[in-house]
A protein has these predicted regions:
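Conserved Rossmann-like nucleotide-binding pocket used by diverse enzymes
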Residues: 69, 174, 187
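Residues embedded in well-ordered beta-strands
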Residues: 20-22, 40, 118, 132-134, ...
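Active-site and channel-lining beta-strand-loop segments
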Residues: 20-27, 175-183
Length: 203
């Protein structure tokens, strides 16, 4: 079907000959291949870079454990294809699970009234991190209505098993514009710094 064809084309693909590709958890153990459990993507192959020029420490970290650490998060599906879901620096680690900020953003962006969205993880004593969502809304839309749509849509994805139960945001913040980098990307580093002291207990 057209839907299956689109889904196939969005995959990164299968590793080629001589490529040893793994998806691992924080203890460098391979994650279960269940089409939803994600981990860090690491690889080794004869043609991969040996490291950084004049930076032995960074090179050592890059090849920690004998594999090149790509900095990407994803999973290998039941066909053996790699699907990248996020960057490891942007992943939200909550309740012992890795939650894709991009997946949350994709879901929320489809809600009526949302012009732009960013999902970030804020440090939490109990759960490690908790997700919060920053939304730039369409001017005429009511924030309470948008909140309801966002939580309902995320709840539906959780019920379907497409999202972890820990993905429900503790807080939704509204701004006129979401901060960008010099190349026009959402500046999540700045957002994490800006909202690091936010009280997630206040919904």
């Amino acid at each position: 079907s057209q839907k299956e064809l689109i889904k196939m084309r969005t995959k990164t693909g299968k590793p080629g000959p001589l490529v040893d590709l793994r998806v691992v958890d924080e203890n460098y153990k391979d994650v279960v291949r269940d089409n939803k459990s994600t981990g860090e993507i690491i690889a080794r192959a004869p043609w991969l870079t040996n490291g950084y020029i004049k930076d032995k420490e960074a090179s050592k970290e890059l090849w920690k454990g004998g594999y090149l650490h790509t900095g990407d998060v994803g999973y290998i599906d039941d066909t053996g294809s790699l699907i990248i879901t996020d960057r490891i620096k942007d992943i939200i680690k909550s309740g012992g699970e890795w939650i894709s900020s991009l997946q949350i953003e994709d879901i929320v962006s489809k809600c009526k009234g949302v012009k732009e969205v960013a999902a970030i993880g804020i440090k939490d004593v109990k759960w490690g991190e908790r997700p919060i969502i920053i939304v730039a809304k369409i001017a005429r839309e009511n924030t309470e209505d948008i909140n309801k749509r966002i939580r309902e849509r995320i709840s539906n994805e959780i019920k379907k098993g497409a999202l972890s139960k820990w993905a429900m945001p503790d807080k939704i913040e509204y701004v006129k514009e979401i901060e960008k980098t010099s190349v026009g990307k959402i500046n999540k580093k700045l957002l994490r710094e800006k909202y690091k002291f936010i009280n997630t207990n206040e919904k």
